[in-house]
């Protein structure tokens, strides 16, 4: 089944805050550089790459010398505004090193749910990919809000990456996190926890196994990743959950190596 990953042409890569920010709050420039190199190389191979990148608030905290994430919405959105600009500046520097053009795409949930604007977003993605430009996507944290009568947030970038995967009809979603894949238990607590190599169906039992929030600077936990996988499988697409500490692991994933957890419809096959 994993050999089919070698044939994936249109690929969405999602990187979490934990892959971009050290636990002490500093920006992991080495990881960002490695990510830019990897995605640029894949683009040169003829792959169509879309990057969904978290990290706006984490980078903003670093830029503003703040050690604690703000609690009020206006403060969080101000930090995100500062961080998004700085994050794109860093990406632009690193991708330029490898002569790869990139573009920023900021989305909110209402834009995707309204058919006309959703169609415009899809057309923009198609045009960027046609021009061999890597779109870098994030939720527009500066304006997105979550209210009962006006819901504009996706929830987190795990959901956003699955939605992007859906609207561009990608072959594969590669979700890079701070964990090696989906385990039978929390591997940081239980050393006997086993890694699922392949999951074909998302059920309540799996959600029971998933628990806890994400990193101090991010929002997504394992339940969020399961929800994203559920959306991906519903659209007959595939998703890999793997550790993003070394972004070049994407090369090995696309070679079909047994890395992380593969979420895909159907059972085990000889291929």
From Swiss-Prot:
Q: Which UniProt keywords apply?
A: Amino-acid biosynthesis, ATP-binding, Cytoplasm, Kinase, Nucleotide-binding, Proline biosynthesis, Transferase
User: What domain of life?
Assistant: Bacteria
KW Mitochondrion (keyword) present? no
- Might you give the EC number(s) for this enzyme? 2.7.2.11
One of the protein's GO biological processes: L-proline biosynthetic process
List the SUPFAM superfamilies hit by this protein, alphabetically.
Answer: Carbamate kinase-like
Q: Where does substrate bind?
A: 54, 141, 157
Q: Which residues bind ATP?
A: 14, 177-178, 219-225
| The protein's name in its UniProt record | Glutamate 5-kinase
Q: What class of enzyme is it?
A: transferase
Organism for this UniProt entry: Enterococcus faecalis (strain ATCC 700802 / V583)
